[in-house]
Each structure stands twice: as structure tokens, then as C-alpha cells.
Amino acid sequence: MKKLLITLLMPVLLLPNIAKAADTNGDVGEQFRVLHPEVWSVGVLIDDSANLKKQWVSLQAFTGTKPGNTGQIVDIQNCSSYGTKGCESSKYFNYQAMLPYCATESAVNCISNVVATGPDGVSHKATFVEEFPGKTKYSFVGDPSANLPDSGSNFIVSIPDMPHSKGDKYLIASQLNGNKQGADPKFNTGRFQTGIYAVTIVDGRYQVPFSSIELSHYPNAYIGNTAADNSGWDYGINAMPKCAQMSETRCALAWPLPLDVDFELTFRMQVEIKGWLHGRLQDAGANISSSNGLETIKISGKPVVVPIVYKTFPRDQVPAVVTQYYANDPNFEQFGYHFGSATGQISTVKGLEQFSTGEFPEALVWYQAISDTAPYSSTAWSFRSIQSGQLGNGCNNDSSTLKGLVTTNSNMYVASPPVFNKAEQSLDYQVTSPHFLPDGSVFKGNYNLVINSDFARCIYGFTQAPISATVAVLSADGSSQVATTVLNEKNGWLRLSASNFTFSAPTIRVLLTQEAKPTPEPEMTTQAAPQSKVKRITITCAKGKLKKTLSSSNPKCPNGYKKVA
């Protein structure tokens, strides 16, 4: 099993030589980058922030060896539109698009509103500044009938009343990707991801990432693979760039986000966003509504501090806990980020970024190797999509809606919906992280679950009556931690959170309950007791020759009459 885990981690990626061992020049964590070790080394990288940075757009058509353009790749074309020469609809397609600012009321697949709310509860609407990076030579025109969005661009806004430490500019970076099989009439939506960055803009000369059309860059050469020609380059310092986003002449440098500001993004989407979202938010909120074939999605929350684990060791100084773990794995140095030339001394950095429970044991080994202390940390406001998975009771049959949002500040977590624990009748969620931050302080975790109320009721078979919940944080040994927990239900969404728990590998267990509808007591009715039949007495009374017969319960003869019978 361990061999399989390593195999799935990361394709081999050769990166340029760099003469620095680590980012030791005082850069803030928001500008973290992986640099070349000075000597032949082995190391680890556990950081999901890089996937959101330095985005690019592309629309590519693939020709394959088998019918329907499947099988091995024989040709790749960059496309500026769909269905044109070389980009015929019969081919296999991959696309990467950015979601721009909604410039008009009729614009779709865009972000219509950016709002920041301070600790005083006052909200401030952001002002659009510019598209960034703007249009590039890889931009393309979408096709709504084929569910293909325009290539778009990320953008920068200004929020003067909610500044960060270096100014009031914020980069809104949102990306959508998808694909289309040759025989399919429409594109399938793949990953949807978004981040907010506090930025300043600097001038320079940069190589921006782009999708390669060189077959040699596709090691397996099968339809469905994607490849970037490079991860970007800063010609000014001859190194990988620190930019969160860049053009050929400008760089958006990221700085710490204000942790007490709640940011809210509103998306106006024609392309459906479904399943689950996961990410880096505190006090997370989600809302979705549909009208006239469009979805309006609102995601809100505060930034969090996330540990970044990156450490390399000279090959002859790898800690024993690491060498023992990989002792029986012949592929230990075959999979990961590879640095250097083909000299036999190619440094390997293991990239743990599948975010699955299978990687947790490996992560815990590396935590031990770094004394359970994260070398870096960064503020983050981000989320991305995942599929619904199988959460029991057939409740995922409606795949057209957003089911929920799970967020945490943990270095590593399971990037899927909470697992329904049938034995405990609970929703379980696993996280793991180093115990300490770079400054030596104890790292305190948080967890937020926002789940569609109808979906939660379906899982448990609940009625529409109110739901209550308990949230327990269980340490690795099964003991329960003391944590602050919150539950509320509003506008069709259940919101639960747990905070201030410690690591290294706790499980968050959410138990939803609902009081049974009281069985009505039998209605008490009072019936009149049946009246007993009154006994009637008959007498005969006489007065001279006159006689009267009287009948009653107590008959008496009239005055002047005498009872004779």
C-alpha cells in the first residue's frame, strides 16, 4: 500500500537550477516558493496554496490514436475559439478559464460583488481597479451552447476602508477548468477554485506559465493529461517568482491578509457549480440561489493562518524516522518534485497534496522529522470544489446543486465531504498539522461545516423540525478535547464550527440529532354518566264517588282525596 501511495503523489517535474537552499531572505509566508536545495537532498512539501497562484488560461484540442480522439496523444493545438479549424468539436478538449469582474448586469460566469466587513460590522463594497493579467495570447472566446466560458481574467480591487499592512489593493483570483470528450456536445465542469490576496504591484520581467503543446512534456502521452511548460520565472532575480499572479511585465506580490475582516464574493454563474467546496476560511458562510437559468453563489468568511511544511535534508542526513518509514519502498526517490540535471544527483521533494487519509501517516512522519514545528505559515482566504462522493442514503442523486462547504486552517486535511460514520451516526472529518507554528507558539485549529439543510436531513432521515448538534474533537488516542463549538441554521443552511483545538491528528465528529415529534396523548373526553331509569309508582285516590289514578316517582293524593289503592 505504501508503494501505491508514493506512486500517486506527483508526476516527475524537472525544475531549473537555483543556487539557494531555502527561502531564507526574510520573505513573508504569503510569498513562499520552493527553491533548489544546494546539495543532493530529500525533502517534503505540504502546501496547497501554490495551486491557486500564478494562474493562466488555455483552450487546447487533442487528437488521439483511437476513435473519438481517445488513446495516446498525437497532436495538440492551442485554440482561440471552439469549433474552428484545428479545434473541431470532434476533438478532446481541456480548458482553463479565469472568472472576471462582472462588467455589466448581463455578464455571466463572473464575480459581481466583493464586500469586506470589519469588526464593527460595517460592510464596504470594493471598487474594481483593473483586470490582471488581462488578455493574453492564449485567451479564447467561449461558447455558451457548449457550456464553455470565456477565458476571462483575474482582477484587482481597492478597499480603502479595509486596508492591509501594505495598502488597499486585493487580487481576486478565481479559476474554472473543464474538459470535453470528442463525442460529447458539451464541456464538463471540473475544478472551481478561488483565492483573495492582499497585494502590491511591482514591475519586472517575467515568464508566465502556459499550457504546453510539446508532446515531450506529456510523459504518459495519453488523452486527458495536462501540462504546464513551466511554473513561471523572474528574470530579474533569475529565480522562481514570488508573485501570486503575474503578467510579462508586472507582479502581484502577496502580503498578510487582515484576519479580522470578513470577505464575501458573489458569483453569477451560467456554468453550474455542484458538489462540495473545501478551503481556508474561518466563520465560513455559503448561499446559493437560482433564477432564469443562472446561479448566484455567495461565499464568505475570514482569512486564517495555515502552516506550510517544506524542509529538505542532505541525502546523508535524512532523519531516521523518515528512512525507516521508506525502508521498504524502492520508489522513495522516484516520485515527487525533482531538482537538478540528469547527473545521478537529482534532489527529490515529496509532494503530499492528494489530501487523503492515505497520506496522513506519511505526513506525521515528516512532522516528527521537523520537530513537529512548521517552518513557514501564511494567511489564506480560499476555497475549491470537490465531488460529492458517497455520503449515504442516496442523497447525492441531485448532482446539480451545491451540497456544502468544509473549511479548516490545518496544514493537511481530507479534501472531501465529511464521512458518514454509520456506527456512531456522525459526520467525521480528519485533519493533521504540526503542533507548533514557526514562532514556537502552539497552533490552534479551526473547522467549519456549512451544509445544505435538506441534504443533512436526507442523510439522517430527519423531518423539517429543527436540528440540534454536538461537535466533538477527538485526539488521535480517542480522548475528547475541549473546543469552542457553534451551531445555527439559517436560510436553508446548517453552520457548525469548532475552534481552538490542538494537533497533530484529531478527528472532528459532528452528531446531528432531532427530537422525535411528540406522540399526541389520547384526547380525554367526558361523557355524562348514563342516567338510571327512574322507578314510577302508581296510586289511586278517591273523594266520594270520584277516583283519580296518579303515576310518578313519588305520587301524592290531592287535597280532599284519600289513597285507596
Where are these regions (language model features)?
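Secretory targeting and sorting signals
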Residues: 1-22
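Processing junctions and N-termini across compartments
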Residues: 15, 73, 81, 96, ...
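Charged, amphipathic alpha-helical stretches
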Residues: 23-123
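Long amphipathic alpha-helical coiled-coil/heptad-repeat bundle
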Residues: 115-118, 124-127, 144, 149-151
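Extended, non-transmembrane interaction/recognition domains
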Residues: 158-538
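Mature, structured domains enriched in cysteine- and short glycine motifs
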Residues: 529-565
